[in-house]
A protein has these predicted regions:
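C-terminal structural segment of proteins
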Residues: 1-301
Length: 301
């Protein structure tokens, strides 16, 4: 059955949003909602938050506070452009956006939408979790509350967001210049991640890694920090032995399951391969057995 066409409201003043959201549903890029509506989901009234994007920059940097503020209602393309145009440095998030879906989807999808769907496979969330993000939420009375991202994520399709609330921005401590993101999916574009990894660290003059933070998606009910593996790497040179120990420690941080996209066994093997590649990028001198990320043909084994 085709859902009834919704009434669309598009405020341009943040002060109007809370009033309009009474009995309505917030929408930004709508990339997830469109899929839900094809499955019959009703949404009689939608409040389009993208009208708020013109009132502020996509990314702002507060050097005094050492903090980046990222809009939750701008398209991902605008966020990536803001990060590469000098508004801030966030290599892991920039890389995640570059690998997110397709150009068309990136021109519509938003950080806010990617957060509130509560998907453990969401591609922007590992970078934000690794960076220690805080979520700014507007309450129905127009007030503001802030929640750590780790506490915002409650489970598959569940987040700490009450009726009438909406996400306005995400704030992160200024990330280091060294960071990245890798994902494994069924193809290079328009693919949900079988699993993904974001990382960031400082590299000291002697080569030791400090401030190591890792986060992985699709290996637990929510995106999770790899705290045990990060502790192994902290203040260490990423030698072969240290990397082997960090890779072995991943099992303590993840709890993947078998599902339609991949088996738990496949995900554990890919998790090890992704972290190894982040720490020791493949080179022409690598041993033949050093990189063991399995092929997608093995995903159901």
């Amino acid at each position: 059955m085709t859902p009834t066409a919704p009434t669309l409201l598009r405020p341009t003043d943040p002060a109007d949003v809370s009033r309009l959201l009474a009995g309505a549903r917030a929408v930004a890029g709508g990339t997830d909602l469109l899929v839900q509506r094809r499955a019959g989901a009703e949404a009689p009234t939608l409040v389009d938050l993208t009208g708020l994007a013109g009132a502020r920059p996509a990314v702002t940097s507060d050097d005094a506070a050492g903090e980046l503020t990222i809009s939750a209602v701008h398209p991902l393309t605008d966020i990536a452009n803001g990060l590469t145009d000098g508004a801030g440095v966030f290599p892991a998030l920039t890389a995640a956006i570059c690998q997110f879906a397709s150009t068309t989807i990136r021109n519509r999808a938003t950080i806010g939408g990617n957060l509130v769907t509560g998907s453990p496979a969401a591609d922007t969330v590992p970078a934000l979790l690794a960076a220690g993000a805080a979520i700014d939420i507007v309450t129905p009375d127009g007030g503001l509350r802030t929640v750590d991202l780790a506490e915002f994520l409650l489970g598959p399709r569940r987040v700490d967001l009450a009726a009438g609330e909406w996400v306005t921005s995400v704030r992160v401590p200024q990330p280091p210049v060294e960071g990245g993101f890798r994902k494994i999916g069924g193809r290079r574009a328009q693919a949900i991640s079988f699993l993904n990894l974001a990382w960031q660290w400082h590299r000291e003059p002697d080569g030791r890694l400090t401030g190591v933070r890792l986060a992985m998606g699709s290996v637990a009910p929510t995106v999770v920090r790899l705290r045990t593996a990060a502790a192994v790497l902290e203040a260490q040179l990423p030698t072969q032995d240290v990397v082997d120990a960090a890779v072995a420690a991943i099992d303590a941080d993840i709890s993947p399951i078998d599902d339609l996209r991949a088996s738990a066994h496949y995900r554990r093997r890919c998790a090890a391969g992704l972290l190894r590649e982040a720490l020791l990028p493949p080179s022409g001198t690598a041993r033949a057995d050093q990189y063991v990320t399995p092929t997608t043909r093995e995903k159901n084994q």
